[in-house]
């Protein structure tokens, strides 16, 4: 099965008030767990590779070929989006598209809005004729993830409206209080601003840094237009805690499969739980495929 664009998937999710999870991949076994979870839940899924991990994972072509091969070997029948997370430049986004990625995020959020819009327009122009979806970001999500470090800077409503109207993006990540990594204290999301941004942009919104946000707040973000929710830290914590417990009980263990398998199973269960929480379980639909 080829990868699919997330454009139609997110439009469907927004219309029917559920969200599709983006789960970041950290290697072959990790990817396998995400795909297994999606197939068992009959949920569409967004498998994402952070631009800051692309080289660690072997490069754009390696990531694309690995995920495509797993889809074929595992007979995955649900829609799978292969997404570049936090693309650092238009050039990097183009490399991902050329390698077979079906969706990209251009992260110009640390630049002035005019530069952000210019970069985003360049990516949309390249992606659009190739049926590849594009996500952009306004404002700054705080915390640290895959080397991305920063403080929270709320998205400006006017800038959100501008970038949507001037670029033709398919999804918008508007920073409204979420953070990458673990939360220090309770999350403090800007629901009032969220509602207004959803109203003026009228496109699917993306929630970054969703790990650790309580289920009732997640449900509220979905009601307010979020159709894509990004999860990474919760999966990493599940894997790490399980792996640590294995070594604590078996300090002399050295066979990788023996200690990796329980951790990967923990990742899979975390993904399945999130799919149910987001309401995407049972929502697998057919959409446009991107051949690689």
Swiss-Prot record:
InterPro entries: Aldolase_TIM, Class_II_FBP_aldolase, FBA_II, Fruc_bis_ald_class-2. Coiled coil: none annotated. One of its GO terms (molecular function) is fructose-bisphosphate aldolase activity. One of its GO terms (biological process) is fructose 1,6-bisphosphate metabolic process. It comes from the Bacteria. Its cofactor is Zn(2+). The modification Phosphothreonine is found at residue 233. This is 6-phospho-5-dehydro-2-deoxy-D-gluconate aldolase.
